[in-house]
């Protein structure tokens, strides 16, 4: 059972920002933001044609500045948010804005990646998440499964909840909270939990993970020294409401139960340098992706702490032949393991993410502008499904 070869797409600029087009559930589409100091920055809309194993692309100009983070609206295919650097009077400020892509590009196109006649189009600015008083924005996260009207931005030591007005033409600050403590505390990453009616957000600052209740903007849990060095990213298990994964500069990936934060449930130590990105599969939460500046992407099978630790159990009533019953998967917990290590990158991998339209497909992005699309090995896919 031979697996498909990875598909590689090269951007002409350096890049570190990647997101799936979250609201698109039919086509496989990713958005990539570039980092160039000399030239106009771009957002590449990457369409993956699964049947023919080829990439089609469109390019949007992002003239506001180099892109450090990108996120897509969960409700509107055409809307996205970027965090970007703006230089004024030799001062660099990290800003955030919400944009709309041209209508005809929301559902992709069939332009060849090598078409020299293709011209870049511009984004329409919908609103700034004006944070001049709060500091530099690290990331913008959308309320999951929402109507695309609520976002949170993390700016230095502030967590800011915004309400986007109709057609996203204005962002109104609904509430905020500030990190308290010694020293220069700054947020590095955040994720909005899909559980608890979307009322919880987790943030990373230095080596600490914190949970926040968005209704009161108060802290609900705190995991101090979650990592030995800076925490780079985190993600919520989509199927187990108290489970959270984090990664950091100590080369580790840790899994937490937020009801008991004294120690991690599990720790992975497969990378040899900083781990920049961790992502749970949206459907099969035992599949966990990580990307690191050791230039590798690792796909792990964390089945023992997943929502199906015994595999896919079949109800006795579904089995007509008792002989078949013995052929069913055993009721013993399955073993955690590294499924595959992907080594198509030659530079630091800053972002990994799953496609929103296909649970078996994922993309990774390294700083040299190389985007790689890979699939979960077929043997494992059928093992999970059957």
Swiss-Prot record:
Modified residues annotated as N-acetylmethionine in this record: 1
Keyword Isomerase among record annotations: no
Family annotation (SUPFAM superfamilies): Putative isomerase YbhE (SSF101908)
Keywords, sorted A to Z: Acetylation, Golgi apparatus, Phosphoprotein, Repeat, WD repeat
Residue ranges of the TM segments: none
Location(s) in or outside the cell: Golgi apparatus, trans-Golgi network
Protein origin, superkingdom: Eukaryota
One GO cellular component term noted in the UniProt record for this chain: GARP complex
Positions where Phosphoserine occurs in the chain: 320
InterPro entries, sorted: EIPR1, WD40/YVTN_repeat-like_dom_sf, WD40_repeat_CS, WD40_rpt
Record bears the keyword Acetylation: yes
Subunit text: Interacts with two multisubunit tethering complexes: EARP composed of VPS50, VPS51, VPS52 and VPS53 subunits and GARP complex composed of VPS51, VPS52, VPS53 and VPS54 subunits. Interacts with SNAP29.
Family note: Belongs to the WD repeat EIPR1 family.
Stated role: Acts as a component of endosomal retrieval machinery that is involved in protein transport from early endosomes to either recycling endosomes or the trans-Golgi network. Mediates the recruitment of Golgi-associated retrograde protein (GARP) complex to the trans-Golgi network and controls early endosome-to-Golgi transport of internalized protein. Promotes the recycling of internalized transferrin receptor (TFRC) to the plasma membrane through interaction with endosome-associated recycling protein (EARP) complex.
Name of this chain's protein: EARP and GARP complex-interacting protein 1
């Amino acid at each position: 059972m031979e697996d498909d070869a990875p598909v590689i797409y090269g951007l002409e600029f350096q890049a570190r920002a990647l997101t799936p087009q979250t609201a698109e559930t039919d086509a496989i589409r990713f958005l990539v933001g570039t980092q160039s100091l000399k030239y106009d920055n771009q957002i590449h809309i990457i369409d993956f044609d699964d049947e023919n194993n080829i990439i089609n692309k469109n390019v949007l100009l992002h003239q506001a500045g180099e892109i450090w983070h990108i996120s897509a609206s969960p409700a509107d295919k055409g809307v996205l948010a970027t965090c970007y650097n703006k230089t004024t009077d030799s001062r660099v400020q990290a800003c955030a804005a919400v944009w709309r892509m041209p209508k005809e590009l929301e559902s992709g196109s069939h332009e060849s990646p090598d078409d020299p006649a293709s011209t870049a189009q511009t984004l329409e600015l919908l609103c700034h998440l004006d944070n001049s008083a709060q500091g530099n924005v690290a990331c913008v996260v959308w309320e999951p499964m929402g109507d695309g009207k609520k976002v949170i931005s993390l700016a230095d030591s502030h967590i800011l909840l915004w309400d986007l007005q109709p057609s996203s033409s204005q962002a109104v600050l609904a509430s905020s909270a500030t990190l308290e403590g010694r020293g220069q505390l700054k947020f590095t990453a955040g994720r909005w939990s899909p559980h608890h009616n979307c009322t919880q957000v987790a943030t990373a600052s230095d080596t600490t993970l914190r949970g926040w209740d968005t209704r009161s903007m108060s802290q609900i849990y705190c995991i101090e020294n979650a990592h030995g060095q800076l925490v780079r990213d985190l993600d919520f298990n989509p199927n187990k409401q108290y489970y959270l994964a984090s990664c950091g500069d100590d080369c580790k990936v840790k899994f937490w139960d937020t009801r008991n934060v004294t120690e991690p449930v599990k720790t992975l130590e497969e990378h040899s340098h900083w781990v920049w990105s961790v992502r749970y599969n949206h459907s099969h939460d035992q599949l966990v992706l990580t990307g690191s500046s050791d230039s590798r992407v690792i796909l792990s099978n964390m089945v023992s702490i997943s929502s199906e630790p015994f595999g896919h159990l079949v109800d006795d009533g579904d089995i007509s032949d008792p002989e078949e019953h013995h052929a069913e998967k055993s009721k013993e917990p399955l073993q955690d393991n590294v499924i595959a290590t992907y080594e198509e990158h030659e530079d630091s991998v800053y972002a990994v993410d799953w496609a929103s339209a296909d649970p078996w497909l994922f993309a990774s992005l390294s700083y040299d502008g190389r985007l790689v699309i890979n699939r979960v090995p077929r043997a494992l896919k059928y093992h999970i499904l059957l």
